[in-house]
């Protein structure tokens, strides 16, 4: 899911061509080299990563994947390789509207989350009265925030901070408690 910097994203190489970059592709290459295997990375939307793992059509999935217990029926997980967190993001100009998580729960708010992500559950849990808008790419969530179509969004902290650094009109307004703080590699069940 190459819209999830710093986990995975496209960077422009010295020839002006987009190249997959980030710490997930770097870790995947390291693991493949260590095991003496050939690595093939297939970029896809996040919800596609989950579906392909569940169907067994890929060997592993690396997409800032949280080892959520609800996913355990469909896949196995590596140990956590990155400890992170969850955040609520909004426009800097609207940060005062969100002093705490309870303030995100208003029917007049549109709150974004990435389809298939744990952030959907966080939105449903913390902002159940809001209009929860599911989008397949984090880049679409960011565009909707900046364009004023979303009031806020639930995004993994490292990703939220990366976007806020590149788009100063954005603000990481709140830390969001979550029991599973970190990322692991999703592996085909029983593999």
Q: What label would you give each PLM region?
A:
Residues 91-110:
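Flexible hinge/capping segments at coil-to-helix
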Residues 18-26, 44-47, 113-117, 136-139, ...:
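Soluble non-cytosolic domains of exported or imported proteins
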Residues 30-34, 42-43, 47-60, 74-76, ...:
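Short helices/loops that flank or line small-molecule/ion binding pockets
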Residues 2, 22-23, 34-36, 48, ...:
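Extracytoplasmic
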Residues 8-15, 28-37, 101, 105, ...:
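Ligand-binding cleft/hinge of the Venus flytrap
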Residues 1-4, 42-47, 56, 60-68, ...:
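Beta->alpha turn/N-cap motifs
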Residues 1-64:
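Extracytoplasmic small-molecule ligand-binding "clamshell" domains
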Residues 83-92, 157, 161-191:
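Periplasmic-binding protein-like
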């Amino acid at each position: 899911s190459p819209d999830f910097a710093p986990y995975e994203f496209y960077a422009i190489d010295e020839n002006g061509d987009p190249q997959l970059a980030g710490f997930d592709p770097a870790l995947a290459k390291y693991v493949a080299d260590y095991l003496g295997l050939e690595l093939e990375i297939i970029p896809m939307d996040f919800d596609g990563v989950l579906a392909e793992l569940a169907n067994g059509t890929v060997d592993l999935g690396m997409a800032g994947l949280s080892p959520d217990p609800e996913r355990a029926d469909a896949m196995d997980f590596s140990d956590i390789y990155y400890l992170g967190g969850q955040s609520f993001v909004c426009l800097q100009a609207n940060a005062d509207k969100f002093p705490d998580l309870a303030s995100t729960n208003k029917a007049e708010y549109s709150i974004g989350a990435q389809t298939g992500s744990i952030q959907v559950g966080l939105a449903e849990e913390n902002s159940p009265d809001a209009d929860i808008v599911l989008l397949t790419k984090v880049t679409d969530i960011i565009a909707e925030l900046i364009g004023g179509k979303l009031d806020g969004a639930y995004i993994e902290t490292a990703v939220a901070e990366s976007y806020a650094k590149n788009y100063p009109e954005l603000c990481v307004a709140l830390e969001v408690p979550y029991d599973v703080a970190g990322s692991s590699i999703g592996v085909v069940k029983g593999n």
